[in-house]
Amino acid sequence: MSDCIYNIRKRSDMTSATQNKKYKVEAYTDTVKYYYEYLVELSKNKYKSILPYIQYILINAIKYRVGEEIPENISPTIKKDYQNRIINIIKQIDDDVIINTNKVVLDTKLYLLKLKYDELPKDDLEFKDGFAYFKNKKIDKIINKNSFSITNMSLKREKLWINGLIKMSSYFEFNHLYVDEVGKTYKINLLETDKNRKSFLNDDMNIIKSFSGFITLDRKKTRLMFYTKYNELDIIFKPNINIDKHNKMKKRCGILKNKIYSVKNNRTLLIEHFLLLRFVIKYLREVQMYFKKN
């Protein structure tokens, strides 16, 4: 049921296309009334409750709506009524349905639970072993492949400069990136960005922060581990190298100026900084060209 599929009417012309619906008043009035609320009442009248299958249909539709800002052409009255109706439906959805619906990231699940309970009950929320739990039920991984990305790296006089982004649920408060390098820990400040994902209530569903800093490399070969802290919890990131979008080997190994980097165990970044021999450079370039052509 968490992967439910349902049919949608064939659209008669481009004026009713999906990409235009967010600017139409009907999307915030008729759709909610004659689709979402209709299903709720139909199920209650026939079965005295909202069937799990109906709940999955509703949550699969609503999950997109809570993560979209309402356009300015919608009047404040309609906007407020729409928000209240959506929240009222969410309050009738079972926790298990919100938690177990597939293809919904942790940010959205936590936000849906927050809307249901007005505020997330901290006593019921737990983080351990890299997962988030609500009332002892596993929700999802705390981080995913898009949570941490390195957008630029450069080596200057034994200093490795690193730039990147951290993307996490707005539930977490995090202000620093920590980099562990054999016996040393570096603390890099995180900066606010204007890339946060806004909800239909115009608050933040997730927070994206940028970082820029350097670490001093005293060895020819070292390992780096990246993490941030939330209260007493260490949130360890899996390096996502995003230097060259055309390089299909970027997640496993690559070449940047005068160093080799590679990801080991999905958690640590192995740095070898030395001048490469000409044949090694030539070989790696040939491999890169092969992947680009194919």
What are these regions (language model features)?
Residues 2-34, 68-79:
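Nucleotide-sugar-dependent glycosyltransferase catalytic core
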Residues 33-49:
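Short amphipathic alpha-helical segments and their helix-coil junctions
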Residues 45-294:
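Non-catalytic N-terminal targeting/anchoring module and adjacent flexible stem/linker
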